[in-house]
Amino acid sequence: LGHRIIDVARSALVKAYDVRLALAANGWIVTGLDVHKGRWFHLGRHEEHPARDWHSFLLIGDERGSGSRSAASRVTKLKPAQIADIIESASSREENVLLAHVHEDPELEADVFEELDDNKQARLLHARTDEEVAGLLARMRADDAADAVMDLAQERRQVVIDLL
């Protein structure tokens, strides 16, 4: 509870405020989550809000949960613009996990970078090596790649262009 997760249907980061459990043969399992924030002074109970199916959400940042829920394959099923929006609202840790999943599909990674706002894109490219930046730019549309090159530091531009 309290950790942010991806609401796949809404393509947004949300917090779980209540968990629904069921007893299975091998122990308790999560069956649903309530992402509705409780009201002040506890007016309205969580029991009054329907829990949504556990499979409608995607854990991020928890390697045990991410692996067992095939996080990478579920993240990559979102549209590039949706992934970019989620990355833009993510914390640094969440951002790193999402970028690692997206990095597994180079074409999707390029599409996501095309959708990021200019400041976020520039910051993320700054953190990569020249070779990584060149590889990413090579898969981007020409106009987006040109804009990204212009956002690079002056001393990196020619090096990256030479690597293309």
Feature-to-residue mapping (PLM):
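Hydrophobic packing positions in regular secondary-structure scaffolds
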Residues: 1-164
